Amino acid sequence: MSNMPVLIITLLLFSMYISTAAQKPTEIKCRYPADCHIMCRKVTGRAEGKCMNGKCTCYY
C-alpha cells in the first residue's frame, strides 16, 4: 500500500493549522481593508489585514 494518501492528508491538516494560527481576529470595526492597515500594524507589527464581516482580521 502507498503512504501517499496519508502524507497528503497530513500536509492538508498541517497547512490548515498554520493558516488559522497566523490570523488574529480583532474587535476593530472597519468598512474597507484599508481601514485595517494602521490598526494591524499596532496589533501585530505588520500592516497586513483585511475587513471581514465588519471587523479587522490581522495576519502575522
UniProtKB/Swiss-Prot annotation:
Tell me the organism. Lychas mucronatus
* UniProt keyword list: Disulfide bond, Ion channel impairing toxin, Neurotoxin, Potassium channel impairing toxin, Secreted, Signal, Toxin
Question: Upper taxonomic classification of the species?
Answer: Eukaryota, Metazoa, Ecdysozoa, Arthropoda, Chelicerata
Q: What is this protein called?
A: Potassium channel toxin alpha-KTx 12.7
The cysteines joined by S-S bonds are 30-51, 36-56, 40-58
Q: Per the entry's comment, what about the domains?
A: Has the structural arrangement of an alpha-helix connected to antiparallel beta-sheets by disulfide bonds (CS-alpha/beta).
Pfam families in UniProt: Toxin_2
This protein's major location comes to secreted
What is the protein's known function? Answer: Inhibits voltage-gated potassium channels.
The tissues in which it is expressed are:
Expressed by the venom gland.
Family to which this protein belongs: Belongs to the short scorpion toxin superfamily. Potassium channel inhibitor family. Alpha-KTx 12 subfamily.
GO CC annotations on file: extracellular region
Q: Where in the cell is it found?
A: Secreted
GO molecular function list: ion channel inhibitor activity; potassium channel regulator activity; toxin activity
Can you tell me where the transmembrane regions are? none
Under the heading InterPro entries, the entry gives: Scorpion_toxin-like_sf, Scorpion_toxinS_K_inh
Cleavable signal peptide: 1-22
